[in-house]
Amino acid sequence: MEQHRLCYISRNYYNLTSAGNKAKTDNEDTLMEMGAANLGLHRTVHDSKILAFFLDLAGIIRTCFLLRKGDVLFLQYPVKKYFSFLCDVARRKGAKTVSLIHDLGSFRRKKLSIQKEISRLSHSDYIIASNENMKSWLLAHGLEKPIGSLGLFDYRSLSFHEPQASSSDTTLNPTIVYAGALSMRKNSFLVELTKSLSAWSLTIVGNKEGLRGLEDNPHVTYRGFLPSEEFISHVDADFGLVWDGDSLDTCSGEYGNYLRLNSPHKVSFNLRAGLPVIVWKESAVAPIIKKYGCGIAVGSLKELDNILPRLSQEDYSDMQERARQMAMRLNQGYFLKEALRIATSSM
């Protein structure tokens, strides 16, 4: 089989802490580990929009000169302004493009029509959807390009949480942690949860000033903001919760509905900390969590009042070990490597 040179384009990032930027830079690190060639400039971190524009433009121009016939150019979609252009340049030079979707602007933010997004994606030779649900959605809406799926976004970190052995039964008083940016638009369900929670304990990691109406509850602990590396190495919880919207009974609203299609970076973040995750059963990641046995999928958070007491210590320990194994996979770039192996084997 003909050997193709795998290439990518590093760029400027405004920061390395946001979920989107972290996922992209982790992928760049995996590509570098795989021996891929960076045709752009070295990765930079500047918050100046003007400087970022010229740095990214210089990287794009450099790529156009260095790209060769037979290359496979890996793109992280969306690529601001240059996606269709890069795909067309690659085609004219006899190279192929493989594009990993991080976000669909037509589904959540409605920044463009579905037809326009499908048309834009169709410039690429091969698409890697975030997961199988997104893959099915794209095919149902007219995408005719070869397509695979990622599953979960990898999560690389220097830190790793090594759970301490305990003589107590975790299932008697489980603690669930919810970490992330807090806002009424994204996770107001937490307000309702603090009013009614009594069967288990909740730790909220984030700036609670973003949520109005949070109530004092002996079962709820507020930790404030924690850097990601500190969270991963020191989190004291039994499960990580991934839930969006304003309801305890379902994931609703703009962010909640998007869970049907995307693979939240928060899932990978919690798993990297060695935490089994609790996810919505209608989310795109639920089948993955079930497949690997590293968490629980529920239709409503109210179900936890019955599920958690019935979870034996043996079952929890097995789930925790599977989460630990998943943490190692995520740190090694397993999901991207596998998706790229499948993509390039078809070229």
Residue ranges of predicted features:
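N-terminal pre-catalytic "stem/leader" segment of glycosyltransferase-like enzymes
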Residues: 1-85, 93, 282-285
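Membrane-proximal helix-turn-helix segments that form the acceptor-binding/catalytic region
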Residues: 61-68, 89-93, 108-127
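Active-site proximal beta-strand in glycosyltransferases
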Residues: 72-74, 90-107
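A short, active-site helix/loop in glycosyltransferases that binds the activated sugar's phosphate group
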Residues: 109-112, 123-147
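Conserved catalytic-core segment of nucleotide-activated headgroup transferases in glycan assembly
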Residues: 156-233
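A charged, aromatic-enriched C-terminal amphipathic alpha-helix characteristic of glycosyltransferases
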Residues: 167, 299-346
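Nucleotide-sugar-dependent
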Residues: 232-273, 279-282, 286-287
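A short acidic/histidine/glycine-rich donor-binding loop in glycosyltransferase catalytic cores
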Residues: 292-298
